[in-house]
Swiss-Prot record:
Its main location: cytoplasm. This is Serine hydroxymethyltransferase. The record marks 228 as: Plays an important role in substrate specificity. Belongs to the SHMT family. It comes from the Bacteria.
Length: 420
């Protein structure tokens, strides 16, 4: 607990004890939620810095408050590093989250009620890609596209939808799709109907900068991403663009501030700058390659054990297990796995007949386990344990024995050594 002030335990024992329990949970659980990762100590130090004190509405050299000389330097550095990392002309580092970044893009380029194509939520899309429960589906008219019977993105169907509806924007990206996206085809379809191509690369940004996932940036008019997930930075958002004009970039900036946000979170922007520096290293690229290897090695075990993997495999850091063929629901599966200290999330499958609170599947991702040092051997072992549990959900002794094995494995690969 040495990242906390020595006297904090005395000052607020309740919060201290809760955080201590969460540290133990993170250390003793195998984290397989695809959107979660472990930030470095350097990133966390920035998030806990005195930069949280400074209000800085506006942009560098154009603030509404005084005292921003060094704040400007930090934001400029974050922008400079992001431009280099992603090879882009435009960056906005201020969005508080991926959803905020997406909202800003919609606000900049659309009017309420405009027609947009987005990936269907239970086919792998995200809430902000047109879900009726989300602002995107309430403010704009979304038509959903999805995957074919093999679980692959159906570009022919997308083209037909685009030709029929003539949308103002097509959104590409996902939260639970295990394949590649052909951005060139996406741009072709967008150009065919005169639509903006907006790419949300939140899940695969780390893979893209490492050169192992198709890059959306040369094809999309605008790109957003989160800065955690595979990028392994602080929780936050980012807007990127290349080869646009000043007017286009001003629209995006204005949509963030003053359009959808007030003051930026400078402690988070500093943490983003640190994460961008980390992402430029050879170590980071090796990490990205390993997390895909780990994902594929887990799929290999599930297929060997006759489990149904949506789309038949994975080309990135995640995949979906369809549990309907074994009569198991996603919410129950995730609950039982948690008893063995294995954390996954319930997830809808394409054309799921169950509602999103129950689901027919679970999503599995490898960013966190890879960050703590797991390689193919450990990943396969974890996959075997998951299979054993899902095939024997009422065997409490087996589940407890696997829990002990999980804890022992976790302590061989600590997340943060100094927290023990």
């Amino acid at each position: 607990m040495n990242i906390y002030y020595k006297n904090f335990k005395k000052y607020d024992t309740k919060i201290y004890n809760i955080i201590k329990k969460e540290i133990i949970r993170q250390e003793e659980h195998i984290e397989l939620i695809a959107s979660e990762n472990y930030a470095s100590k350097y990133v966390m130090q920035m998030q806990g810095s005195l930069l949280t004190n400074k209000y800085a509405e506006g942009y560098p050299k154009n603030r509404y408050y005084r005292g921003c000389k060094y704040i400007d330097e930090i934001e400029d550095l974050a922008i400079k590093r992001a431009k280099k990392l992603f090879n882009v002309d435009y960056v906005n580092v201020q969005p508080h989250s991926g959803s905020q970044a997406n909202f800003a893009v919609y606000s900049a380029l659309l009017n309420p009620g405009d027609l947009v194509l987005g990936m269907k939520l239970n086919h792998g899309g995200h809430l902000t890609h047109g879900s009726k429960a989300n602002f995107s589906g309430k403010m704009y008219k979304f038509i959903s596209y999805g995957v074919n019977g093999e679980g692959k993105l159906d570009y022919n169907k997308l083209l037909n939808l685009a030709n029929y509806y003539r949308p103002k924007m097509i959104v590409g990206g996902f939260s639970s799709y295990s394949g590649f996206i052909n951005w060139k085809k996406m741009r072709f379809i967008s150009d065919k109907v005169g639509a903006y191509l907006f790419a949300d690369i939140s899940h695969v940004a780390g893979l893209i900068v490492a050169g192992i996932y198709p890059n959306a940036i040369p094809y999309a008019h605008v790109v957003t991403t989160t800065t955690h997930k595979t990028l392994s930075g602080p929780r936050g958002g980012l807007i990127l663009a290349k080869e646009g004009d000043d007017e286009f970039y001003k629209k995006l900036d204005s949509a963030v501030f003053p359009g959808t946000q007030g003051g930026p979170l400078m402690h988070i922007i500093a943490a983003k700058a640190v994460a961008f520096k980390e992402a430029m290293t050879l170590k980071f690229k090796k990490y990205q390659h390993q997390l895909v290897k780990n994902s594929k090695s887990m799929v290999e075990i599930f297929l060997k054990r006759k489990f149904h993997v949506v789309s038949g495999g994975t080309k990135n850091h995640l995949f979906i297990l369809n549990l309907s063929n074994i009569g198991l629901k996603g919410d129950l599966a995730s609950e039982i796995l948690e008893k063995a200290n294995i954390t996954v999330n319930k997830n809808s499958i394409p054309n799921d007949k169950l509602n999103p609170k129950i689901t027919s599947g679970i999503r599995i991702g490898t960013p966190a386990i890879t960050k703590r040092g797991f390689k193919e051997i450990e990943s396969k072992k974890v996959a075997e344990w998951i299979c054993d549990i899902l095939e024997n959900i009422n065997d409490k002794k087996l589940i407890n024995n696997i829990k002990i094995k999980v804890i022992n494995l976790c302590y061989k690969y600590p997340v943060y050594k100094s927290f023990k």
